[in-house]
Amino acid sequence: MSNIGKAIDRFTGKPVEGGAANIPGSPAQKRFEYEDQIVSRRYEAQKQIQSMHQPKLYSDRELRRLRFIYSKNHKEELRQPFRDLRNKITLNHATKGGTVLVTSVVPDYSTDIFCRNLAATIAQDESCTSLLINCKQEKDRLDVTDEPQVKGLTDYISNEDLLVSDVIHPTGISRMRVIPFGSTNDNSMDFLRSTRMRVLVKDVSHRYRERYTVINAPSVNMASDVELLNEYANQIILTIPYGKATERDIARAIKRFDKEKFLGAALIDIVPLTGILSKIF
């Protein structure tokens, strides 16, 4: 086990395991009924999802520019960690969707790439949809429409005339939607504690049972209000940019969240030309 794995184990009290999905043990009959419920629900959801509006799909060139991992350009070893993580998320909340909070130990744009690939991988399951909420400005913003300025999170927070539906936009990935950060250049994180923020997160988290929401939050050790989102999340993932965080940084970050919601940590390394390498602890 690596030093990072040992640190996570020590501060969470949970054994660190490599990317496979963890399914809680239960009597055989209850497990059978649970799986039958999942299959039934996903079949129903798949029929409903087929009617979702999809204005365009990203070209291979756009996928490369935005650092998406996709089958034509990436090896299986790059895609599998995200599939394993998707399985853990969807199996833990298979019948009612879920909200995943993703935050980094230290500020780094690799978390943006991780979040968009996690949301895209969830959406690859035809019985699921994903919604990415960007709570910080991205280095490379997703092209969501042909309009130069689209309404986003901070616009919704500051304008009470806007509805939640006004800031949810399709992406070039089937079944994946995004709420961009917004048009403001204000880097203040004060909006995280606003009533409008609470309303938005509750709305998108409970409206559709087949939707999985990924919240791309600021670094937990830099923005104190990030932990306010803890109450909305079913699961929490901590990203660790390769070579940029100490064991002390990791321990301090983990202590700020509910241990029961802590899904794991992802060690991320951005590789030129090929994209993103992730190891899930």
Give the positions of each predicted feature.
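C-terminal lobe/tail of nucleotide-utilizing enzymes
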Residues: 2-82, 191, 248-281
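P-loop/Walker-type NTP enzyme "switch/lid" segment
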Residues: 56-83, 87, 94, 105-109, ...
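Short, well-ordered alpha-helices that flank and scaffold nucleotide-derived cofactor binding pockets
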Residues: 87, 120, 124, 231, ...
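Short coil/loop residues immediately preceding or within conserved phosphate-binding loops
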Residues: 97
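Hydrophobic/aromatic beta-strand patches that form the interior of the parallel beta-sheet core
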Residues: 100, 131-133, 177-179, 237, ...
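Glycine-rich phosphate-binding P-loop
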Residues: 100-123
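Conserved catalytic-core segment of NTP-binding enzymes
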Residues: 190-281
